[in-house]
């Protein structure tokens, strides 16, 4: 075994089973690529990304931990978000929440 390695059974695994999800259309209005990591509070991503931020409050990308989604300049894509779990409090990032959701 390698330190940090995760061994799983064969087959497909559903991520975030039973958690609330939503789809959101996101456009990169900037002139540079924007990359968003798996656990970043989507409400607080780079301001060059245009979408309904109020809807995204309390959600993150519904992708595997440690991965990211890249938005090229001028690109529009639909992403799936999943509700944050645990204590549902957000601290840091851009400092737009700094407490319970």
From Swiss-Prot:
One of its GO terms (biological process) is urea catabolic process. Its EC number is 3.5.1.5. Gene3D superfamilies: Urease, beta subunit. It comes from the Bacteria. Pathway: Nitrogen metabolism; urea degradation; CO(2) and NH(3) from urea (urease route): step 1/1. CDD domains: Urease_beta. The keyword Cell inner membrane does not apply. Heterotrimer of UreA (gamma), UreB (beta) and UreC (alpha) subunits. Three heterotrimers associate to form the active enzyme. Belongs to the urease beta subunit family. This is Urease subunit beta. It comes from Burkholderia orbicola (strain MC0-3).
């Amino acid at each position: 075994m390698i330190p940090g390695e995760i061994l799983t059974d064969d087959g497909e695994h559903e991520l975030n089973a039973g958690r609330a999800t939503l789809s959101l259309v996101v456009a990169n209005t900037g002139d540079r690529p924007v990359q968003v990591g798996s656990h970043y509070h989507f409400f607080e991503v780079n301001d060059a990304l245009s979408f309904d931020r109020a809807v995204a409050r309390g959600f993150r990308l519904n992708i595997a931990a440690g991965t990211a989604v890249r938005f090229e300049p001028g690109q529009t894509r639909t992403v799936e978000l999943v509700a944050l779990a645990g204590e549902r409090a957000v601290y840091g990032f851009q400092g737009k929440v700094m407490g319970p959701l």
